[in-house]
Amino acid sequence: MSKKINRNDPCWCGSGRKYKVCHEMFDDKIAKIAHQGHIVPTHNLIKNAEQIEKIKESAKINIAVLDEIQKTIHEGMSTAEIDKIVYDMTTDMGGIPAPLNYEGFPYSVCTSVNDQVCHGFPSPDVILKSGDIINVDCSTILNGYFSDSSRMFCIGDVSPEKKKLVDVTKEAMLKGLEQVKPWGFLGDMGQAVHDYVSVSYTHLRAHETRHD
């Protein structure tokens, strides 16, 4: 955590209010949680109201792009075409595709088809067929603020097994989101997802690249 400041100093969050009437009680609670051995966020990870609004503005582009993909995705389309739509629409709206050129990644989006778990590379050689399921993972930067979301799409006639996978995954995500609340733990979200999916599937993907 940050160095202790005086109670009458301006709060570290930038609100202009005195620390004692702004984040002092918050920091005291964080300190108690840290003392119990839990990992706690540093001040720079805690966003104020203005920063949250800027993240929401970034997310508006991100969601608009996914909505456009939902309208246009179809059998016979290549995943490279999806990448172009994402790049064109994101930049037209004033944003930057976050994956593009990140550590050399040459695409604006990740496209994962069927049994590809995540972070697939778009390609003109990957043509969507009836029966495919595809995850389109989209991330946007707007004025330095990031947003990130993905969406699953079913192409044409999808088998009951694949449809079940998509439906269970969506419901599991919603169960996890129910646990996103002030002073909750990320582990609560993961546990809710695990518990729900375990009812439908005996095998879970236990290890994968994570977002910190």
Regions found by a protein language model. Name each.
Residues 1-45:
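Acidic/negatively charged segments and metal-coordination signatures
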Residues 45-91:
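Intrinsically disordered, low-complexity, positively charged segments
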Residues 47, 112-145, 210:
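Acidic/histidine-enriched ion/cofactor-binding microenvironments in catalytic or ligand-binding pockets
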Residues 103-115:
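Short, basic/aromatic beta-hairpin or loop at an interaction surface
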Residues 147-163:
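Short, compositionally biased
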Residues 202-211:
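Conserved small/polar residues in nucleotide/adenosyl-binding loops
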